[in-house]
Amino acid sequence: MKLFSRDNEQTIVRKLNRGDATAIDLLYAEYAPLLTAVCARYVAQNEDIKDILQEAFIKMFDKGRTFNYRGKGSLKAWATRIVINESLLFLRQQAKQEQCFLDKEPPDVVRRRARNWLT
């Protein structure tokens, strides 16, 4: 990954603050490999990672108008935090769906699954 200069980061931030869509292209070009790796620490499936990153970049664009640049690295940290939050949200939603599925199973099936899982 190439290193972004502070001027380049500030340019992206200015574009984000203005709502300029080219800021997302620049952000993606610079940080997609890093953000993909961060997301992969939480989620294993490639399709899920792509979906999470898409949601994260949409959120970055939506929230970019209020992002406050605090110096070198703050843009990267902000983008990383959004990806982590989106990954955790995805995992919570998955767990909730799994719980709903398990709640609909008859009690004997739930007991059998629990017994198999524990052994």
What are these regions (language model features)?
Residues 66, 70, 81-101:
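Arg/Lys-rich amphipathic alpha helix in sigma70-family domain 2
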Residues 13-37:
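A short, charge-rich alpha-helical start-of-domain segment used by transcription regulators
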Residues 89, 97-119:
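Internal acidic/polar
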Residues 17-18, 57-72, 93-95:
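Sigma70-family region 2
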Residues 37, 51-58, 62, 73-85:
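Structural recognition of an alpha-helix C-terminal capping motif at a helix-to-coil junction
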